[in-house]
Amino acid sequence: MSEEQPTFEENLATLETIVAQLEQGDIPLEQALTQFQKGVALSKELQTTLQDAEKTLTTMMNDSDQEVAFETPQGGTGDAD
């Protein structure tokens, strides 16, 4: 039986919990390092998910099947960089 992957929202909630624990500063150093590493990994996974979602939203097909960049209200292409 395969285990289901956590949703984006579940991963975000886990990351927020880790950040709160680290901000409190009352956990042992070894546990803090482990939690930090887990947080970094979750952060990378969440960033990848957001980038994939952005690609999906920013690339649309027009009537002649050409990719068209989605325009944001500010006139950009949605790139945060």
UniProtKB/Swiss-Prot annotation:
The keyword Nuclease applies. Residues 61-81 are annotated as: Disordered. The keyword Hydrolase applies. Pfam families: Exonuc_VII_S. It is found in: Cytoplasm. GO terms for cellular component: cytosol; exodeoxyribonuclease VII complex. Its EC number is 3.1.11.6. GO terms for molecular function: exodeoxyribonuclease VII activity. Keywords: Cytoplasm, Exonuclease, Hydrolase, Nuclease. It is an enzyme of class 3 (hydrolase). It comes from the Bacteria. It catalyses: Exonucleolytic cleavage in either 5'- to 3'- or 3'- to 5'-direction to yield nucleoside 5'-phosphates. Disulfide bonds: none annotated. Bidirectionally degrades single-stranded DNA into large acid-insoluble oligonucleotides, which are then degraded further into small acid-soluble oligonucleotides. Heterooligomer composed of large and small subunits. NCBIfam families: PRK00977.1-2, xseB. Belongs to the XseB family. This is Exodeoxyribonuclease 7 small subunit. The lineage of its organism: Bacteria, Bacillati, Bacillota, Bacilli, Lactobacillales. The gene is xseB.
